[in-house]
């Protein structure tokens, strides 16, 4: 169970990082 929670949080963080990179590329 803890493994699934970790994966869920990790994927959420990955999405946030991807969004930040996308916004930075737009602003660059």
UniProtKB/Swiss-Prot annotation:
Gene Ontology biological process terms, A to Z: adenylate cyclase-activating G protein-coupled receptor signaling pathway; epinephrine secretion; mRNA stabilization; prolactin secretion; regulation of protein localization
Keywords: Amidation, Hormone, Secreted
GO terms assigned for molecular function: neuropeptide hormone activity; peptide hormone receptor binding; type 1 vasoactive intestinal polypeptide receptor binding
Main subcellular localisation: secreted
PROSITE patterns referenced in this protein's UniProt entry, alphabetically: GLUCAGON
Disulphide connectivity of cysteines: none
GO cellular component, one term: extracellular region
Pfam families assigned: Hormone_2
Gene3D superfamilies referenced in this protein's UniProt entry, alphabetically: 6.10.250.590
Compartments (UniProt record): Secreted
Residues the record lists as Alanine amide modifications: 28
Tagged with keyword Nucleotide-binding: no
Similarity-based family: Belongs to the glucagon family.
UniProt protein name: Vasoactive intestinal peptide
Species the sequence originates in: Scyliorhinus canicula (Small-spotted catshark)
Species lineage: Eukaryota, Metazoa, Chordata, Craniata, Vertebrata
Gene that encodes it: vip
């Amino acid at each position: 169970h803890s493994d699934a929670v970790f994966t869920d949080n990790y994927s959420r963080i990955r999405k946030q990082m991807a969004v930040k990179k996308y916004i930075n590329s737009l602003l660059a």
